[in-house]
Amino acid sequence: MAAAAAGAASAELVIGWCIFGLLLLAILAFCWIYVRKYQSQRESEVVSTITAIFSLAIALITSALLPVDIFLVSYMKNQNGTFKDWANGNVSRQIEDTVLYGYYTLYSVILFCVFFWIPFVYFYYEEKDDDDTGKCTQVKMALKYTLGFVVICALLLLVGAFVPLNLPDNKNSTEWEKVKFLFEELGSSHGLAALSFSISSLTLVGMLAAIIYTAYGMSALPLNLIKGTRNAAYERLENTEDIEEVEQHIQTIKSKSKDGRPLPARDRRALKQFEERLRTLRKRERRLEFIENSWWTKFCGALRPLKIIWGIFFIFVALLFVISLFLSNLDKALHSAGIDSGFIIFGANLSNPLNMLLPLLQTVFPLDYILITIIIMYFIFTSMAGIRNIGIWFFWIRLYKIRRGRTRPQALLFLCMILLLIVLHTSYMIYSLAPQYVMYGSQNYLIESNMTYNDHRGNSSLSVPKRCDADAPEDQCTVTRTYLFLHKFWFFSAAYYFGNWAFLGVFIVGFIVSCCKGKKSVLERVDEDDSDLSDDEPSLYSV
């Protein structure tokens, strides 16, 4: 009997982890295609490419653990609310520990990438731009700058290991007892607290990146698909008129020196500016002519109705997310245990569409896997749309532009770092969208129901299944490791709560801005620093 139970437990684990393995292969393929799509063909470097692919893949693999975690805790129980024969206390704890060790490993690798490997590779290529430095000097300088990131990581680990987690003792309600139980359930070791604090700090940075890029991208992506780009022939006509106008200005300035007199300093500066402007316009002319006559333009024109349909679909998806997030946050504001608990909520008093949909899909395996994968990919694509539209800035200084097929190695590392942090935040975002699903999955537990019969005297007690919630006994429902990891520190949960309101605000502002903006150019912006690039690059198309 024991052997059969162990075999059943192993089978359930194999199912969950096999799907995780398939997701792993799909993630690696996606990251390779994605990075190769944006990296510069002239400046591509093997180390930066591998680093970008690996760091983005690690983040996506970590997010893929979420449905595995939910799948495993849900499969411990039958739909009638009873535990399966093999799911005794030791086996269930072993399954939970398997997921927890997976998180330990992946989160440790993420810390290594964020605080050592990515900064080292970035500074190495920054030093490589200086032709006078040798390999050893580049490595030494890169290590010197990277040391600052290592110190920050060490400080986060130290603070996380010893930061007090004591909740106020002046709360005696049942909900506060449950909050304390959740904080203590994951464990109290200093190593776990240090890792959780460091990852939560990175997730907080990812939340800021999501507010800036993802919230804007959720509105910009669908509206850009619907509006499309400007007509290449019309743009070329406008560009020709601009060339003629600039040539007239140049001719007017040069005519002042026909009699041999030198031009004043102001006219020389103006002449230089007009000549640079003329070079840029002629580059645009050549590229517009190439695009106007290309088969790709005709193919994109044929796909125009499909793009409009996709744009409308993405708007509905964005509205679904926004409505779900608003209702979830409103529920926390009205029914949570308060800011001192990180706005933890038990159960869903205000139902939202995704929180109702995901538990239903989980009953038809693997539909919930598919939906969560779609949600994560949607966040990736909308974040990318936001980054492409806004660029990478340091306060008011624009550091890099992200362009298809023309992104420098340093910009590519920055891009993957931002996406890594945003993907880290998606776990909490999915919890915000579907808190009940992330906490318990599709678990049920048994409650006693009294029934009165008319044909004889007396009452009868009947056990009926009920969806797991805060009212369930502690030994009847298993909380996911993801949920516990997200709520190890209450002050981070409180910050995420306020960040969700900021996310909604930026989405509304971004939607208004995107509606007011006109159509994008058929070309990516052509600048003076593009002179070393081919005039006939298909990567210039704005899709």
Curated annotation (Swiss-Prot):
Glycans are attached at N80, N90, N172, N349, N450, N459. One of its GO terms (cellular component) is clathrin-coated vesicle. Belongs to the LIMR family. LMBRD1 subfamily. PANTHER family: LYSOSOMAL COBALAMIN TRANSPORT ESCORT PROTEIN LMBD1 (PTHR16130:SF2), LYSOSOMAL COBALAMIN TRANSPORTER-RELATED (PTHR16130). It is found in: Endoplasmic reticulum membrane; Lysosome membrane; Cell membrane; Cytoplasmic vesicle, Clathrin-coated vesicle. A motif (WTKF motif) lies at residues 296-299. Signal peptide: none annotated. It comes from Bos taurus (Bovine). This is Lysosomal cobalamin transport escort protein LMBD1. The chain crosses the membrane at residues 13-33, 53-73, 103-123, 147-167, 191-211, 308-328, 367-387, 411-431, 489-509. The modification Phosphothreonine is found at T240.
